[in-house]
A protein has these predicted regions:
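Residues at the starts of beta-strands that form the adenosine-phosphate
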Residues: 32-34, 82-84, 108, 139, ...
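A structural signal for short hydrophobic beta-strand segments in well-ordered beta-sheet cores
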Residues: 59, 188-191, 252
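Short, well-ordered beta-strand micro-motif
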Residues: 61, 83-84, 190, 215-217, ...
Length: 279
């Protein structure tokens, strides 16, 4: 089974070049970039924890006093990024209460509120472009803070910027950060003419998977204006990614699967708490 999955991986993925940037290049990019925190979603599978505290899941206080949003901001801050915008709707005030204006973290945080109704990540970015909290002249990194980067060796922001700039040199407008696959959550079987020949517990399925982090160049903003409005809830991944892929203008940067934790249920939250206590 593993050999078959390896062949499948080779058929759908080939890596790009290894990218490197200088300290000066990183600083220049960071100074001309806004990091958008997508913190407007409801987080229904963690509703028991969030509703009891009237708190957005990315603002939940971990036992060490931290939050998912705070961890994400510090990761980018330590790489030189200073300008952030939180795209808020559900339990917006809880996010504002935790993050404030960012001064206690050494950064600047603006807020862009979804207009009256949730509009998804596509609409939220369109709204932030319209209200000026994402300047159209600046680069943009969109990070969903419930997609936590953990156990990463080196600087995650530096590496994704290096990968993005390599893609820009090839005419790309955006870079999707991915892992090389995800564990299958069930018992896998190899079957021949009805006979089970092999069992693989929780096999690793080698399909490149987006980790909720995307880097955009300013030239991508016209797509948000054309594709999204503020009348319905739409995430940009389902609409914009296929179009950019068709045009061959979407690049990728791959990180190890062990460095991504999608915190969307109580089990994943408990895992984050465990890992955070070891840092």
């Amino acid at each position: 089974m593993k050999a078959a999955l390896d062949n499948f991986r080779d058929a759908i993925y080939s890596p790009g070049e290894i990218a490197h940037i200088s300290d000066t290049e990183l600083q220049q990019f960071a100074e001309n970039c806004v990091v958008a925190l997508a913190v407007g979603g409801e987080g229904s599978r963690l509703k028991a924890a969030t509703e009891s505290q009237q708190t957005h899941k990315t603002a939940l206080r971990l036992p060490n006093g931290d939050s998912m949003a705070g961890r994400t901001i510090r990761m980018f801050r330590d790489a030189g990024f200073r300008d952030f915008v939180a795209l808020v709707f559900h339990h917006a005030q809880s996010v504002i209460d935790v993050l404030g204006d960012g001064s206690h973290l050494g950064v600047r945080i603006a807020y862009s509120h979804d207009p009256e109704r949730p509009v998804g990540r596509g609409g939220a970015i369109r709204n932030a472009l319209d209200n000026g909290s994402i300047p159209r002249t600046k680069n943009l990194i969109v990070h969903n803070p419930d997609d936590q980067i953990i156990r990463y060796e080196g600087s995650f922001p530096r590496d994704i910027v290096a990968g993005h700039l390599l893609g820009v040199q090839r005419g790309m407008l955006a870079t999707a950060v991915v892992v090389d696959g995800t564990p299958y959550t069930y018992t896998g079987m190899k079957i021949d003419h009805g006979v089970v020949e092999q069992i693989e517990m929780y096999p690793y399925i080698p399909i490149p998977t987006h980790v909720g982090v995307t880097v955009f160049s300013p030239k991508a903003y016209d797509y948000f204006t054309k594709l999204f409005d503020l009348t319905k809830k739409v995430d940009f991944e389902s609409v914009l990614f296929p179009l950019l892929a068709q045009e061959r203008r979407l690049y990728s940067f791959m990180i190890p699967g062990r460095c991504w934790l999608s915190v969307n249920d109580p089990k994943a939250l408990a895992r984050l708490i465990e890992l955070a206590q070891k840092e």
